[in-house]
Amino acid sequence: ATYILDTSKMLTRELKLELEKIFVKGQNFCNLYITVMSFGFKYGIPSDSDLVFDVRFLPNPYYIDGLREKTGNDPEVQDYVMGNEKAEQFLEKLKDMTEFLIPNYILEGKNQLVISIGCTGGKHRSVTLANALYKVLEKQENYGVRIEHRDIEKDTITKRK
Protein backbone atom coordinates (compact mmCIF):
# COMPACT_ATOMS: atom_id res chain seq x y z
CA ALA A 1 0.00 0.00 0.00
CA THR A 2 1.17 3.52 -0.78
CA TYR A 3 -0.85 5.12 2.04
CA ILE A 4 -1.99 3.72 5.37
CA LEU A 5 -4.56 5.60 7.45
CA ASP A 6 -5.82 4.48 10.85
CA THR A 7 -9.42 5.69 10.68
CA SER A 8 -10.65 3.94 13.83
CA LYS A 9 -10.63 7.16 15.89
CA MET A 10 -11.11 9.71 13.09
CA LEU A 11 -14.06 12.01 12.71
CA THR A 12 -15.55 12.10 9.22
CA ARG A 13 -14.17 15.61 8.74
CA GLU A 14 -10.67 14.45 9.74
CA LEU A 15 -10.79 11.56 7.27
CA LYS A 16 -11.89 13.92 4.51
CA LEU A 17 -9.01 16.28 5.26
CA GLU A 18 -6.50 13.41 5.24
CA LEU A 19 -7.82 12.17 1.89
CA GLU A 20 -7.69 15.69 0.44
CA LYS A 21 -4.05 15.98 1.51
CA ILE A 22 -3.22 12.76 -0.32
CA PHE A 23 -5.33 13.11 -3.46
CA VAL A 24 -5.75 16.85 -4.12
CA LYS A 25 -2.99 17.66 -6.58
CA GLY A 26 -1.21 20.99 -6.90
CA GLN A 27 -1.39 21.78 -3.19
CA ASN A 28 1.89 23.05 -1.81
CA PHE A 29 1.50 23.69 1.89
CA CYS A 30 3.15 22.75 5.19
CA ASN A 31 0.71 20.12 6.42
CA LEU A 32 -1.68 22.77 7.81
CA TYR A 33 -5.17 22.69 6.45
CA ILE A 34 -7.56 25.41 7.62
CA THR A 35 -11.33 25.16 7.60
CA VAL A 36 -13.22 28.43 7.95
CA MET A 37 -16.69 27.51 9.16
CA SER A 38 -19.82 29.60 9.64
CA PHE A 39 -22.44 28.32 12.06
CA GLY A 40 -25.52 29.31 14.06
CA PHE A 41 -25.24 29.40 17.84
CA LYS A 42 -28.82 28.12 18.11
CA TYR A 43 -27.57 24.84 16.59
CA GLY A 44 -24.52 24.59 18.85
CA ILE A 45 -20.84 25.40 18.50
CA PRO A 46 -19.05 23.00 16.10
CA SER A 47 -17.32 20.43 18.29
CA ASP A 48 -14.12 20.40 16.24
CA SER A 49 -13.59 24.18 16.47
CA ASP A 50 -10.16 25.42 17.48
CA LEU A 51 -11.09 29.11 17.41
CA VAL A 52 -14.65 30.40 17.87
CA PHE A 53 -15.75 33.95 17.10
CA ASP A 54 -19.16 35.46 17.85
CA VAL A 55 -20.47 38.11 15.42
CA ARG A 56 -23.89 38.54 17.02
CA PHE A 57 -22.83 42.08 18.00
CA LEU A 58 -23.44 43.14 14.38
CA PRO A 59 -26.90 44.24 13.14
CA ASN A 60 -28.89 41.22 11.97
CA PRO A 61 -30.03 41.20 8.30
CA TYR A 62 -32.75 38.73 9.32
CA TYR A 63 -34.83 41.70 10.48
CA ILE A 64 -34.63 43.44 7.09
CA ASP A 65 -37.48 42.15 4.90
CA GLY A 66 -35.51 42.24 1.66
CA LEU A 67 -32.59 40.33 3.20
CA ARG A 68 -34.27 37.75 5.43
CA GLU A 69 -34.50 35.01 2.79
CA LYS A 70 -31.03 35.71 1.39
CA THR A 71 -27.72 34.50 2.83
CA GLY A 72 -24.25 35.86 3.44
CA ASN A 73 -23.35 34.49 0.01
CA ASP A 74 -25.58 37.17 -1.57
CA PRO A 75 -23.99 40.56 -2.36
CA GLU A 76 -26.89 42.48 -0.79
CA VAL A 77 -26.33 40.78 2.58
CA GLN A 78 -22.56 41.17 2.30
CA ASP A 79 -22.96 44.89 1.62
CA TYR A 80 -25.32 45.27 4.58
CA VAL A 81 -23.05 43.40 7.01
CA MET A 82 -19.72 44.80 5.81
CA GLY A 83 -21.22 48.29 5.55
CA ASN A 84 -21.07 48.39 9.32
CA GLU A 85 -17.82 49.87 10.59
CA LYS A 86 -17.66 47.27 13.37
CA ALA A 87 -17.66 44.45 10.81
CA GLU A 88 -14.64 45.96 9.06
CA GLN A 89 -12.87 46.45 12.40
CA PHE A 90 -13.64 42.87 13.40
CA LEU A 91 -12.26 41.53 10.12
CA GLU A 92 -9.06 43.58 10.52
CA LYS A 93 -8.55 42.25 14.05
CA LEU A 94 -9.28 38.70 12.87
CA LYS A 95 -6.75 39.06 10.04
CA ASP A 96 -4.16 40.34 12.51
CA MET A 97 -4.80 37.44 14.87
CA THR A 98 -4.61 34.79 12.14
CA GLU A 99 -1.40 36.33 10.75
CA PHE A 100 0.11 35.84 14.21
CA LEU A 101 -1.37 32.42 15.03
CA ILE A 102 -1.01 30.48 11.77
CA PRO A 103 2.81 30.58 11.51
CA ASN A 104 3.01 29.59 15.18
CA TYR A 105 0.60 26.69 14.64
CA ILE A 106 2.72 25.55 11.68
CA LEU A 107 5.90 25.70 13.82
CA GLU A 108 4.12 23.69 16.52
CA GLY A 109 3.27 21.01 13.94
CA LYS A 110 -0.50 21.51 13.96
CA ASN A 111 -1.97 20.01 10.80
CA GLN A 112 -5.60 21.05 11.09
CA LEU A 113 -7.20 24.30 12.21
CA VAL A 114 -10.94 24.98 12.34
CA ILE A 115 -11.86 28.66 12.64
CA SER A 116 -15.57 28.94 13.42
CA ILE A 117 -17.55 32.16 13.11
CA GLY A 118 -21.05 32.15 14.54
CA CYS A 119 -24.17 34.29 14.55
CA THR A 120 -27.69 33.45 15.67
CA GLY A 121 -28.85 31.26 12.77
CA GLY A 122 -25.67 30.78 10.74
CA LYS A 123 -27.16 32.28 7.61
CA HIS A 124 -26.21 35.96 7.27
CA ARG A 125 -23.52 37.59 9.44
CA SER A 126 -21.36 34.52 10.10
CA VAL A 127 -21.47 33.48 6.43
CA THR A 128 -20.44 36.98 5.32
CA LEU A 129 -17.50 37.17 7.75
CA ALA A 130 -16.42 33.57 7.09
CA ASN A 131 -16.36 34.30 3.35
CA ALA A 132 -14.33 37.46 3.96
CA LEU A 133 -11.79 35.62 6.14
CA TYR A 134 -11.58 32.79 3.59
CA LYS A 135 -10.73 35.30 0.84
CA VAL A 136 -7.89 36.64 3.00
CA LEU A 137 -6.51 33.21 3.89
CA GLU A 138 -6.73 31.67 0.41
CA LYS A 139 -4.16 34.18 -0.86
CA GLN A 140 -1.45 32.43 1.17
CA GLU A 141 0.42 29.49 -0.31
CA ASN A 142 1.94 27.80 2.74
CA TYR A 143 -1.29 26.11 3.89
CA GLY A 144 -4.54 24.84 2.45
CA VAL A 145 -7.88 26.46 3.19
CA ARG A 146 -11.52 25.60 2.61
CA ILE A 147 -14.86 27.13 3.56
CA GLU A 148 -17.89 25.43 5.05
CA HIS A 149 -21.26 26.95 5.91
CA ARG A 150 -22.62 24.38 8.34
CA ASP A 151 -26.05 25.82 9.12
CA ILE A 152 -26.81 28.00 6.09
CA GLU A 153 -29.79 25.87 4.99
CA LYS A 154 -31.17 24.81 8.38
CA ASP A 155 -33.79 27.56 8.82
CA THR A 156 -34.99 27.01 5.27
CA ILE A 157 -35.42 23.28 5.85
CA THR A 158 -37.18 23.81 9.19
CA LYS A 159 -39.64 26.33 7.73
CA ARG A 160 -40.62 23.99 4.87
CA LYS A 161 -41.91 21.30 7.24
For the regions a protein language model found, what residue spans apply to each?
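Catalytic cysteine-centered active loop of the rhodanese-like fold, especially the PTP/DSP P-loop
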Residues: 112-134
